[in-house]
Amino acid sequence: MVLMIVSGRSGSGKSVALRALEDMGFYCVDNLPVVLLPDLARSLADRNISAAVSIDVRNMPESPEIFEQAMQNLPECFSPQLLFLDADRNTLIRRYSDTRRLHPLSSKNLSLESAIDEESDLLEPLRSRADLIVDTSEMSVHELAEMLRTRLLGKRERELTMVFESFGFKHGIPIDADYVFDVRFLPNPHWDPKLRPMTGLDKPVAAFLDRHTEVHNFIYQTRSYLELWLPMLETNNRSYLTVAIGCTGGKHRSVYIAEQLADYFRSRGKNVQSRHRTLEKRKS
């Protein structure tokens, strides 16, 4: 059975995550004090029910040792997993402005910006030991729920999911990436007027990049690196690996290479997802 602990900065989507987990059959509890985690787990053990518990800055223990002790006191039949949701600072500020809700630390007479920064510091002990960190900055409520269903179902089956994610450096580096590869040195289809409005998913762009030896070399060496270390990652109780591929705008080169890598590992029987941050942002 799984005990999914959901945490993250306020406004990052914890309530959405908890609802998605409830739809997946988890017994969900919002804002349970950490010291009560073992009691909850023991009460559910005989019923063979997986549980999900949200922890925010208001019920954080005074020291990390209290959290570690609670984890050690869980029944052996439970496998604890920590999901940490986050978003960039500007996104969190915008979400609070849109909803006009008070930040949990607003009672300390802090500005919203200061409250967000202090919350980040207080939650760092949980973030540093998270099994999965999800950046929700560019996600809608429905996209977050669907992504969590896909990834967390994989985790419950102890299956490593490889996520290949393209992005544009001018939009920022994804904070949920385990590996980041920069492909801005490769030939750029952007400078061909016919290819400029297309994306790395279009055949003419793929044909352009496929003609260059350095593109083939980069793909080969990147997949060889991942193949070398993948067995170690799989045996390290890890269920996901996020590989981010970045070019200047996130439209041509990074998209093509992310798809090539995804297709390669998919053809070898791996559980693979691909995501294109810039293209998804243009659709929304």
UniProtKB/Swiss-Prot annotation:
Q: List the disulfide bonds.
A: none
The record, for InterPro entries, names: P-loop_NTPase (IPR027417), RapZ-like (IPR005337), RapZ-like_N (IPR053930), RapZ_C (IPR053931)
Q: Which Gene3D superfamilies match?
A: P-loop containing nucleotide triphosphate hydrolases (3.40.50.300)
Q: Where is the signal peptide?
A: none
Q: Which GO terms describe its molecular function?
A: ATP binding; GTP binding; RNA binding
In its keyword annotation, does this UniProt entry include Membrane? no
Task: Cite the SUPFAM superfamilies for this sequence.
Answer: P-loop containing nucleoside triphosphate hydrolases
The residues that hold GTP are 56-59
Residues given in the record as ATP binding sites: 8-15
Function text: Modulates the synthesis of GlmS, by affecting the processing and stability of the regulatory small RNA GlmZ. When glucosamine-6-phosphate (GlcN6P) concentrations are high in the cell, RapZ binds GlmZ and targets it to cleavage by RNase E. Consequently, GlmZ is inactivated and unable to activate GlmS synthesis. Under low GlcN6P concentrations, RapZ is sequestered and inactivated by an other regulatory small RNA, GlmY, preventing GlmZ degradation and leading to synthesis of GlmS.
Looking up NCBIfam families in the UniProt record yields: PRK05416.1
- List the PANTHER family: RNASE ADAPTER PROTEIN RAPZ
Q: What is this protein called?
A: RNase adapter protein RapZ
Source organism of the structure: Klebsiella pneumoniae subsp. pneumoniae (strain ATCC 700721 / MGH 78578)
What would be the name of the gene that encodes this protein? rapZ
